[in-house]
């Protein structure tokens, strides 16, 4: 069993839910811009709430757009998760968009992350905090699986398997107990461990008994479920009485 970091996933633009999750003790919370209606204004409010409640606000991007990366980082996100990464070039572009010149291509602005321009906060962020931004990629396809070793050789913090998209790419959508899926997991885990990066898994269904099982496989970052599934499962409890 490896040391485990547990976070969760937020897809509803509701600050109270974000605060409840942070107060519950999740180490990090991923604000999902890919499969939700959350916009940049709402994302900034969620980032603020999560941050002030003592959890790390991460953002899953809707794609690979450098301008979106710039905006969520300026809003104060502590890390980003890039979906459907399949090539080294995509990874390098994501990393570059997170860093200021000369290390990258990110434009410099004065927003929440930079203390709204106050000199000491701005300088601290530019000189120190920007280097603490965590960068994660999602491996969700056969092409990403094929190139994962090269992808992981870049300067990233870790990866997350996108179980639904990966299983669909393996021609078994939503099935995570096939030989093909298990073999894909092994290949990705092995490549990540070689590079010394974190191994993440999004456990979509809120089944706490699966956490230790995933940890035993080698995953050390687990996103436990998502707000809509937690709400749906809990809402149905009175009607599932035996």
Task: Outline where the language-model segments fall.
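Catalytic beta/alpha-barrel core
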Residues: 9-10, 29-38, 57-63, 79-87, ...
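Conserved, mostly hydrophobic/aromatic
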Residues: 8, 21, 32, 72, ...
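Conserved N-terminal beta1-alpha1 strand-loop-helix module at the mouth
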Residues: 1-65, 96, 135, 152-157, ...
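Alpha-helix-loop-beta-strand connector modules within alpha/beta enzyme cores
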Residues: 40-74, 96-103, 126-131, 177-200
């Amino acid at each position: 069993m490896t040391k485990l970091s547990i976070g969760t996933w937020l897809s509803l633009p509701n600050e109270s839910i974000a605060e409840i999750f942070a107060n519950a003790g999740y180490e990090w919370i991923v604000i999902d811009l890919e499969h939700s209606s959350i916009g940049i204004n709402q994302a900034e409010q969620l980032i603020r709430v999560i941050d002030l409640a003592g959890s790390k606000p991460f953002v899953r991007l809707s794609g690979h757009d450098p301008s979106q990366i710039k905006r969520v980082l300026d809003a104060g996100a502590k890390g980003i998760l890039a979906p459907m990464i399949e090539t080294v070039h995509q990874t390098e572009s994501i990393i570059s968009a997170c860093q200021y010149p000369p290390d990258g291509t990110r434009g410099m602005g004065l927003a929440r992350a930079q203390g709204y321009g106050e000199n000491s906060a701005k300088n601290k962020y530019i000189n120190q905090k920007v280097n603490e931004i965590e960068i994660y990629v999602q491996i969700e396809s056969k092409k990403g699986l094929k190139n994962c070793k090269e992808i992981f050789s870049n300067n990233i913090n870790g990866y997350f398997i996108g179980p639904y998209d990966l299983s669909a790419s393996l021609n078994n959508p939503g099935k995570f107990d096939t030989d093909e899926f298990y073999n894909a997991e092994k290949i990705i885990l092995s490549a990540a461990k070689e590079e010394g990066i974190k191994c993440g898994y999004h456990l979509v269904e809120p089944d706490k008994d699966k956490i230790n099982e995933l940890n035993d496989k080698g995953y050390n970052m687990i996103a436990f479920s998502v707000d809509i599934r937690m709400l749906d499962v809990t809402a149905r409890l009175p009607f599932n009485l035996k």
